[in-house]
């Protein structure tokens, strides 16, 4: 009797699957479904709301650990907004930046839980967020400056002969913000999880091959543990980088530089 061995791809963990689906005859052929990415996004929102309620600490004067952690996040995001935009105009964008930071951070952390789903590894999610941010910054620029907003694509002090080429380069660079902002987040999360999956499978195969290989497998196992700590740091760093770049794009819309 032959045994078939199936080799699972490291990309299988990122596959979007239907968990529940319903076909209804309302409004034509209506298909309703709950996917794993939808489920984990719902879980992340629930965790954020729970965290916010715990951090209020029933409005007590003495803060608890949840309150201290939330105040640290507040201070971090507020410092980014003030430094990247400015102390006055930046205040109105602080709630948006805080929501972006905590949403990306929580979804990054959920993805680190074994057998969970990394929502921020999907480009459809990160591109949707980045496109919304860049589009909002562009609308803000036109609202404040009108057609003068196009001066953002004209480098100061450039020769007249090179002006058409430089304007084209600046315009393409501006459009690429939609892609680069979302691509940076998804690519970092995707590559980290793929590497952990490959190393985990490699270590498992070594450690189940005998006592000697089990001892040798402790070396890559230690590396996996260390790399998991690095992934935890990357979860925070990528949320911070996303907010920093979002603030810089908003600043361009406000100040045209």
From Swiss-Prot:
Primary place of residence?
mitochondrion
Compartmental location: Mitochondrion inner membrane
Xref: SUPFAM superfamilies: F1F0 ATP synthase subunit A (SSF81336)
What GO cellular component entries does it have?
A: mitochondrial inner membrane; proton-transporting ATP synthase complex
PROSITE patterns linked to this entry: ATPASE_A
Transmembrane spans: 34-54, 93-113, 122-142, 149-169, 187-207, 210-230, 231-251
- Classification via InterPro entries: ATP_synth_F0_asu, ATP_synth_F0_asu_AS, ATP_synth_F0_asu_bact/mt, F0_ATP_A_sf
How this chain sits in the membrane, per its record, is: Multi-pass membrane protein
Q: Which residues form the propeptide?
A: 1-8
Q: Which UniProt keywords apply?
A: ATP synthesis, CF(0), Hydrogen ion transport, Ion transport, Membrane, Mitochondrion, Mitochondrion inner membrane, Transmembrane, Transmembrane helix, Transport
The molecular function terms of the Gene Ontology recorded here are:
proton-transporting ATP synthase activity, rotational mechanism
- Quaternary structure per UniProt? F-type ATPases have 2 components, CF(1) - the catalytic core - and CF(0) - the membrane proton channel. CF(1) has five subunits: alpha(3), beta(3), gamma(1), delta(1), epsilon(1). CF(0) has three main subunits: a, b and c.
Concerning its family, UniProt says: Belongs to the ATPase A chain family.
Q: What does this protein do?
A: Mitochondrial membrane ATP synthase (F(1)F(0) ATP synthase or Complex V) produces ATP from ADP in the presence of a proton gradient across the membrane which is generated by electron transport complexes of the respiratory chain. F-type ATPases consist of two structural domains, F(1) - containing the extramembraneous catalytic core and F(0) - containing the membrane proton channel, linked together by a central stalk and a peripheral stalk. During catalysis, ATP synthesis in the catalytic domain of F(1) is coupled via a rotary mechanism of the central stalk subunits to proton translocation.
Q: What is this protein called?
A: ATP synthase subunit a
Q: Which organism is it from?
A: Penicillium chrysogenum (Penicillium notatum)
